[in-house]
Amino acid sequence: MHKKQSIVIIGPAYPLRGGGMSTFNERLANQFLQENHPTTIFTFSLQYPNFLFPGTSQYSTEAAPKGLNIEVCINSINPFNWIKIGNKIKALQPDIVIVRYWLPFMAPCLGTILRCIKKNKHTKIICIADNIIPHEQKFIDKPFTKYFIKPVDAFVTMSEKVLNDLRLFTQKKATQVLHPLYDNFGEAVSKKEAQKFIGINETKHTILFFGFIRHYKGLDILLHAIKIIKEKNPNFYNKLQVVLAGEYYEDEKKYTTLITDNKIEDAIITKTKFITDSEVKYYFCAADVVIQPYRNATQSGVTPLAYHFNTPMIVTNVGALASNVPHGKVGLVCEPTAESIASAIETIFDLNYNTLIQNIQQEKQKYSWQLFTNTILHL
């Protein structure tokens, strides 16, 4: 039993749209509250200027999460605001500040806020590092990241790759812990109900590609894999449907052209919009398999969702993806090539589905929120 500690979490949260980090931060705050640690989230009034945001809207249309104290106050591009917010948190004297780091663009803002907090000589600053070296790199990344890291006391990562990247910048205390399961998207629904909600064929094998669509996530590789299946195994292709669920974060035309040129329109169902929290369960429960054909990755928020909803996975052997999906047990691991992905798609439907589900239910016991909070409190 830990002594009661006051906690501030700095990072995305409501009214910013759900998505990995907002959902994670809100669930983490709830866990600390369940363990009797007073917790407040400080989130962004402006996270990205519109010209830097590739989606349609940064803000949620859903109801505010119940029972959470969320201060909407950080402006990522206003240095006067950074000092004001840093001094406000400094005066609160929280025992622990937990700050998310995922993009060097945020380093000046977050690094300045942390320097202000540090002056109270009381608060321990712990960073949950989603990325240290971003997927798409720029020349400013290293100096910005160094600026952010300096006031941080300790780090938590959710993949070995991020931990190794961190070691290129600092030898401060750091530990790796598994990404806990998202269990705040509601209970599972029946496959029939889920497929009806989405409006898809209930007789076909359903593969789900879920999340924001960006180059590193390899959707183009998946589309080439579906073309290979059509050419080599037309009977299997006719039983297949691929649901693309998520908002484009780059040029949509690149993908729609691929679908048309590969003549696979009849197998692709596009739900290319932002998927709200209340809709998530329907997509995962409708799917027979969740696929992550990523070119590169650190960790993924899709894997914990698949575990939560007991959905088998196909992942590529990049970053931490493979280490979180035991091959042949809860899904398949393949190479990030169209040929390897096509083979994995054909193979997974030959495996015993009930055995995969049983293995998932056993494997997901490792992904605990209490383990995650314990790790933070022990740093």
Task: Please provide the spans of the model-predicted regions.
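N-terminal strand-loop element at the rim of the active site
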Residues: 11-18, 30-87, 91, 162-163, ...
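Donor nucleotide-sugar binding/catalytic pocket of nucleotide-sugar-dependent glycosyltransferases
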Residues: 150-189, 377
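A short helix/loop element that forms part of the nucleotide-sugar donor recognition site in Leloir-type
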Residues: 186-200, 232, 257
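Conserved donor-binding/catalytic core segment of Leloir-type glycosyltransferases
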Residues: 201-217, 223-226, 243
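Nucleotide-activated donor-binding/catalytic signature segment of Leloir-type glycosyltransferases, i.e.
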Residues: 253-278
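Acidic donor-binding loop of glycosyltransferase active sites
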Residues: 282-298, 311
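Short hydrophobic beta-strand element within catalytic cores of glycosyltransferases
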Residues: 306, 312-315
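Conserved acidic donor-binding segment of nucleotide-sugar-dependent glycosyltransferases
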Residues: 327-339, 345-352
